[in-house]
Amino acid sequence: MDTFKDLAARHDALMAEAPGMRIRDRARKLHVTEGELVARQLGVTARPIACRPVEIYPKLGSLGRILCLTRNEWAVHERYGQFQMVEVNPKVGLVLGTDIDLRLFFSHWTRAWEVNDNGRISLQFFDREGVAIQKIFQTDDTDLAAWQKLVDEFALAPAADPGAQAAGPSSAQAAGAAVAAGAGAPSAAAVSVGAAAQAAGITPEQAAALLAVRDAPVFEPLKPAVTDHGATLDEAARLHLRNRWLAMTDPHQLWPMLQELKLSRITALANVGEDLCQQTDLLAIEKVLQYASEHELPIMVFAGNHAAVQIHGGTVKKLMRAGPWFNILDPNFNLHVNTDAAVSSWVVNRPTDDGPVTSLELYADNGDIIVQFFGLRKPGNPELKAWRALMEGLCAKPLHR
């Protein structure tokens, strides 16, 4: 593990080489997590807050219009609007409304900060490995007084000095680096806290805190990457899977069913039968979004990670390709998908009490979902005929009805 001094030096060198690089990309280059850079205040100013989303999220409606960002390694889902109905318990959260629609799984949430990244201010929540779960950004229409009240209520440290805040992230970074530089000398154990504070331009109390945590592990090590291209089941297992699949009455029954059967999602798709799950070409995402844009077909777009899923419901308009990224760039909704990372694309056909519900789903090399698309529907209603026809048009073989 890097000491603070080592990591700060490598970070400074990277910033000098690529000053405009985003924090997530810097973390990847440095072989650390984004949370590690935030916790060490490298390139950002960060104020720790209590990671108590069960208490925080019901209060987010008071902030007015915000930007809610949820992402995984390959897709970024951004939705502007105001939090409306929020239901939480210690394990899960449900956010519903015309603007913000979320499914939250709190067992993974461990750390939180208010972050100032070059003047862009957000609340950021991380898992135990330092992977970002969700970020809530201020907009021009955010109620700043309500924001400050919320942050102060849950803050674990006093606010930064106004002068330091105005100076930007470099102030906190310089202070930490100055303390670390003093503490990194051969006689580190004998370093005077007062001398370190004077060198850094901070109080002795702040210097003592920095010295105490400068090299302490903040997050657990990242789990090694895996691949999952699906296993081949024997005939009995395939038949059992198919019968269970056909017995579904609600789309949300799929995940617990796979947990019970101890099957990865990609294994289930590959074995349940082509009338229920059918692989498409990787360009299907562009075809579907182009059709939805041109015909004003309302859709649902799901993207997220192990701890949060964010949903857009409505039409999409402005589409743009930028290198490997295919983008939706609408006033209240942005989606960025790295299509080069997709190794498979599937039409997934779920039986329900309201008739079949179909989706287009992109998968990464490790078997994780990159993004999902459905036709817009409410429980109790059948899926849109135009959406069903669009999904059937992607398939070489008929889908089960």
Language model region names:
Residues 1, 15, 94, 101-179, ...:
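Hydrophobic, ordered structural segments
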Residues 1-119, 399:
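An N-terminus-focused feature that recognizes amino-terminal "leader" regions
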Residues 1-33, 296-310, 314-316, 320-401:
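C-terminal functional regions that serve as terminal interaction/effector modules
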Residues 16-41, 231-280:
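N-terminal, charged amphipathic alpha-helical interaction modules
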Residues 43-74, 119-121, 276-309, 351-356:
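DNA polymerase processivity clamps
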Residues 59-61, 100-105, 111-121, 293-294, ...:
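Short, low-complexity cationic-aromatic patches
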Residues 76, 130-135, 309, 367-371:
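Short loop/beta submotifs within extracellular cysteine-rich repeat domains
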Residues 253-324, 328-329:
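Long, positively charged binding patches that form subdomain-scale interaction surfaces
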